[in-house]
Amino acid sequence: MASTEPERENREDETEVNEDEDTGAQVAPIVRLEEVAVTTGEEDEDAVLDLKSKMYRFDKEGNQWKERGAGTVKLLKHKETGKVRLVMRQSKTLKICANHLISSGMSVQEHSGNEKSCLWHATDFSDGELKDELFCIRFASIENCKTFMEKFTEIAESQQVGKESTQGDEAAGLIENLSVEENISEEKAKEAEEKEPAKEDKETKKEKVEEEKKTEAST
């Protein structure tokens, strides 16, 4: 008696082929994902400086330096206001290590004993609240450190000039207002002087009339 096993295997193979066959039907996804615009907050700023580095902050309680992360430090200038801020993010997690404005009066100095590092004080906002921090940053080369320090100092000085110009404009405005007020006061004084003789003439005429009346009464 012939075995029917091969025929059975053939039928199973055909069934598997039919199950795997592409019918061409389109299957709609269960969840539709929409594109989300990702913003970094740097869209309205131009990068003045962009360097690889490692940043530290001084822990006052522990009296020691603590690493904030390694990544790229940027000096970003706002396209409208002209203000410059320092921003650094960790290279892998993109967590913010530092985020503060460079304002007039700020200074940066070389770390003693290490020409590749420098430090400065700043009012930082990287943790979501303003804090006075002492930062130290280390670069791969002395040249990069010098470039950073020179640019930092240049920006701080330019902010000082801008501040003085603003104060100068405000002072000029006050002087101009003062001059206008003085002119108005002078005009009022002249008007008062012009009115004064007329008033005196009226009083003189009045006195003459009274004297004439007295003379007539006595006669």
From Swiss-Prot:
The keyword Signal does not apply. It is found in: Nucleus, Nuclear pore complex. Pfam families: Ran_BP1. SMART domains: RanBD (SM00160). The keyword Nucleus applies. Residues 1-11, 185-219 have a biased composition (Basic and acidic residues). Disulfide bonds: none annotated. GO terms for biological process: mRNA transport; protein import into nucleus. Keywords: mRNA transport, Nuclear pore complex, Nucleus, Protein transport, Translocation, Transport. Gene3D superfamilies: Pleckstrin-homology domain (PH domain)/Phosphotyrosine-binding domain (PTB). Residues 26-161 form the RanBD1 domain. SUPFAM superfamilies: PH domain-like (SSF50729). GO terms for cellular component: cytosol; nuclear pore; plastid. Residues 12-23 have a biased composition (Acidic residues). Residues 1-30, 160-219 are annotated as: Disordered. This is Ran-binding protein 1 homolog c. The lineage of its organism: Eukaryota, Viridiplantae, Streptophyta, Embryophyta, Tracheophyta.
